[in-house]
Amino acid sequence: MKAKITLNISKLVVLFSLILLVSGCNTTSIQYDIPEPLVDETIYLSDPSSFNLTVIGGHLILPNAGHGGILIYRRYFDQEYYDFAAYELACPYHWNDGCGLLTSAMGDLYLTCGCNDHQYQALDGQSIDTAYVLPVKEFSCQFDGGNILRITN
């Protein structure tokens, strides 16, 4: 009887180990070559320079933050933290090249690399070409639901 209980416990341990191993296989960590800059920016939406962030699709560029600047994009108007996205404006593939800045025109839904015209979606930072696996580097946004937006890493 004792051997049977030990055998069942052994089977359970093996089963749980396999489940953990298999579930861990799908986790992928994005490795950027871009060094991690210190980012801690506070944006006040009531400031006239931030007016574009009061509408969905509006954006604001912080030229002296990150490596190539930071683009803040208004995705939604739910008064929640996920309303905004903040992206590094240095291309994940050409960040160290002079041409590697991402640009976007007001109302444009894409960020375009200056080196090869490759495009990324402004909504989520993903590449529109599956050959490019790295998305644009995204920073954390905290929004108080009213006037204050904080961008950090």
Where are these regions (language model features)?
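N-terminal pre-ligand scaffold of iron-sulfur
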Residues: 26-106, 121, 137-153
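C-terminal motif of bacterial Sec signal peptides marking the signal peptidase cleavage site
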Residues: 20-24
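Acidic, glycine-rich flexible loop segments
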Residues: 108, 115, 123-129
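Bacterial N-terminal signal peptides that target proteins for export
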Residues: 2-14
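Short cysteine-rich clusters marking metal-coordination/redox-active sites
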Residues: 91, 112-113
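Conserved binding/recognition cores within well-folded domains
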Residues: 17
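Low-complexity, intrinsically disordered Gly/Pro/Thr-rich segments
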Residues: 124-140
